[in-house]
């Protein structure tokens, strides 16, 4: 037994020394030694070779269309009125006041079948399917055995991801999160002053950079001249909790979000000690009013960190942007839109919170190949004259969707856990009733 420990301790000593010197210290100061870049180049060539083998073996049939996000069904962007008018085009004009025809039934039947087969909403709450297999078991739903070489490569990949990368990533993430809790808690005991704010920003920045290395994250920031400034509000599309890690690698933010339990709750309580983050319970109406007032006070203090808000209110699978809650746009101040787009070929960053706990999700992230994403800082936006909060939110959302190459959807992300509101159904019914009996119909 003594011989076992005599061998283990030197191995662990060398392991931690390499992690600290080659990865952790450079990460803390934002320096790269080229290790991640070399790994990514090798990974890209490996996946390109695997893709070529898969495509060669499946020339007889197309594995998938351009992307699963394009869907099984080709939909038009036409409105209810436009599509029904198209169906009625060849029908003789009726002399009756009523404008109902049997062909109208075809429109509603088609929409119903389309929603049953593949709707626009629920597919945004599941992981995006890939055009070509990326050698991860969890994404092998549509790709079967191809060749012995590809199988051997997959086995080698499993060994690399679980026996080499996973221990390394767990080590780095544990160090990063531990330092974050200890550092923010310690800084929290200091009186409010410039030194406390500076130390808080330093602790957050260093710890998030270590955590990013723990995910083998490769982040490409674009248009840095548009980075959020103090006293502003940064809004971004939301894919997972690591969105915070990604953005905080390039600057510090005061965060606004839902109260969580477990590991997330521990981190939230520790971070709140050193920085004016705002956590709330979404179901409590009283919390909403308090949050709104705190946000207004924060924005009015131009010396405080920019606020980071995810207006969708839930995680979407990075193929689209769903409805932005208007509360973030009623506060006033300058909005700094940010578009985040992950590359699913290297790893699925989407957190399906209804299916995976935060620990299960982190394990999936740490056993992926890497996290690769692009972040675009967009020009600051403000309210236009005569524009209400909803219109402003939709304008910001459209800008983010266009830059990130995402689908712009008007649906509420809350449909992940709730049913469609009756008011939306009534809105569609009113539209059709106006077509049938005219605009003067009673509601």
From Swiss-Prot:
Name the UniProt record assigns to this protein: Glycerol-3-phosphate acyltransferase 3-like
Q: Which organism is it from?
A: Danio rerio (Zebrafish)
- Which CDD domains did the record assign? LPLAT_LPCAT1-like
Q: Does the keyword Iron apply?
A: no
Q: Which UniProt keywords apply?
A: Acyltransferase, Endoplasmic reticulum, Lipid biosynthesis, Lipid metabolism, Membrane, Phospholipid biosynthesis, Phospholipid metabolism, Transferase, Transmembrane, Transmembrane helix
Q: Which reaction does it catalyse?
A: sn-glycerol 3-phosphate + an acyl-CoA = a 1-acyl-sn-glycero-3-phosphate + CoA; a 1-acyl-sn-glycero-3-phosphate + an acyl-CoA = a 1,2-diacyl-sn-glycero-3-phosphate + CoA
The record's annotation in PANTHER family points to:
GLYCEROL-3-PHOSPHATE ACYLTRANSFERASE 3, PHOSPHOLIPID ACYLTRANSFERASE
* The protein's annotated pathway: Glycerolipid metabolism; triacylglycerol biosynthesis; Phospholipid metabolism; CDP-diacylglycerol biosynthesis; CDP-diacylglycerol from sn-glycerol 3-phosphate: step 1/3
Q: Where are the transmembrane segments?
A: 15-35, 146-166, 170-190, 358-378
**Domain note:** The HXXXXD motif is essential for acyltransferase activity and may constitute the binding site for the phosphate moiety of the glycerol-3-phosphate.
Q: Name one GO molecular function term.
A: glycerol-3-phosphate O-acyltransferase activity
GO-annotated biological processes: CDP-diacylglycerol biosynthetic process; triglyceride biosynthetic process
The organism's taxonomy opens as: Eukaryota, Metazoa, Chordata, Craniata, Vertebrata
**Where does motif HXXXXD motif map?**
238-243
């Amino acid at each position: 037994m003594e011989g076992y420990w005599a061998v283990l301790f030197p191995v662990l000593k060398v392991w931690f020394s390499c992690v600290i010197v080659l990865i952790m210290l450079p990460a803390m100061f934002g320096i790269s030694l080229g290790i991640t870049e070399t790994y990514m180049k090798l990974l890209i060539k490996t996946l390109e070779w695997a893709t070529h083998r898969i495509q060669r073996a499946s020339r007889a049939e197309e594995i998938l269309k351009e992307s699963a996000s394009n869907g099984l069904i080709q939909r038009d962007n036409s409105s209810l009125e436009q599509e029904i008018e198209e169906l009625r085009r060849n029908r003789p004009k009726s002399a009756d006041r009523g404008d109902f025809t049997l062909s109208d039934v075809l429109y509603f039947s088609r929409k119903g079948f389309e929603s049953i087969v593949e709707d626009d909403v629920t597919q945004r709450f599941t992981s995006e399917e890939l055009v070509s297999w990326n050698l991860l078991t969890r994404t092998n739903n549509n790709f079967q055995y191809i060749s012995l070489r590809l199988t051997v490569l997959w086995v080698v990949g499993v060994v690399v991801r679980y026996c080499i990368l996973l221990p390394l990533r767990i080590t780095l993430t544990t160090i990063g999160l531990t330092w974050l809790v200890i550092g923010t808690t310690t800084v929290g005991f200091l009186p409010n002053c410039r030194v406390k704010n500076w130390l808080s920003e330093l602790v957050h920045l260093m710890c998030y950079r270590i955590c990013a290395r723990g995910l083998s994250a490769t982040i490409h920031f674009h248009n840095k001249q548009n980075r959020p400034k103090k006293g502003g509000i940064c809004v971004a599309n939301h894919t997972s909790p690591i969105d915070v890690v990604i953005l905080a690698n390039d600057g510090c933010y005061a965060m606004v979000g839902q109260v969580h339990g477990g590991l997330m709750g521990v981190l939230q309580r520790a971070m709140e000690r050193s920085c004016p983050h705002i956590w709330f319970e979404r179901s409590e109406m009283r919390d909403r009013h308090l949050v709104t007032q705190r946000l207004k006070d924060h924005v009015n203090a131009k010396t405080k960190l920019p606020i980071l808000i995810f207006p969708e209110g839930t995680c979407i699978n990075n193929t689209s942007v769903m409805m932005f809650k208007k509360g973030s746009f009623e506060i006033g101040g300058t909005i700094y839109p940010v578009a985040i787009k992950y590359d699913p070929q290297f790893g699925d960053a989407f957190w399906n919170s209804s299916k995976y706990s935060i620990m299960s999700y982190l394990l999936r992230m740490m056993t992926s190949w890497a996290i690769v994403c692009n972040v675009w800082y967009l020009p600051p936006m403000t309210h236009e004259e005569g524009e209400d909060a909803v219109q402003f939110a939709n304008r910001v959302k459209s800008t983010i969707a266009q830059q990130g190459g995402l689908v712009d959807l008007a649906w509420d992300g809350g449909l992940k856990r709730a049913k469609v509101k009756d008011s939306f159904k009534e809105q569609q019914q009113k539209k059709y009733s106006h077509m049938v009996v005219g605009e003067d119909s009673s509601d």
